[in-house]
Amino acid sequence: MKKKALAVLVNDVHLDKSNGDLVKDIFRQLIQVCEDFKTNRIICGGDIFTNRSAQPMICLTDWKDILDMLRKAGVCLDVIPGNHDKTDPDDERSYLDVYSYPEVILHRKGESCIIGGHVFVFVPYFTDEKWLEEFQKADEIRESQFAEGDVEEDACSFLITHSGFDGVKNNDGSEVKSIIKPSMFSEYTKVLIGH
């Protein structure tokens, strides 16, 4: 017997004009994982799209098809914009703003939400300075959710974000230097990062 999950996480889908069928298949599999683990929620940690400057029509319609698939399956999608979903890194707006579905919860700025009795902090991609501002706002809300008894003392705190933190190694082996330090997240149960 499989355990009940709070959500299923996916990051960095990178939908482009050549991989629509593959990405649709990934979401079909995610829906099946949701069914298997008795959840109706997918969390996407950014980069639905690949192109920063413009989206080909096929990408826009493929994403709409995926959202229709999620709706039909009764699956909710929490999503944050990644760097590939924006034209301006410090703008809250992204290509994801053009899709208005009740099942899609777009976290455009730092937010703290209670899901299944646990706290989820969502911080989209921004430049480091703006990211810190958004994180601090969301973290204050998280702290107040615990202080005001909105969640149990032993509830987990999850950070879902799209950023490069200090000390992270890139695929090319280079190391990220950033004002965002891992030590800032000591109160979090898990920090789940896309980029």
Where does each model-flagged region fall?
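Core catalytic region of metal-dependent phosphoesterases/phosphodiesterases
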Residues: 3-6, 13-113, 184-188
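Structural motif
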Residues: 5-7, 40-41, 118-119, 156-158, ...
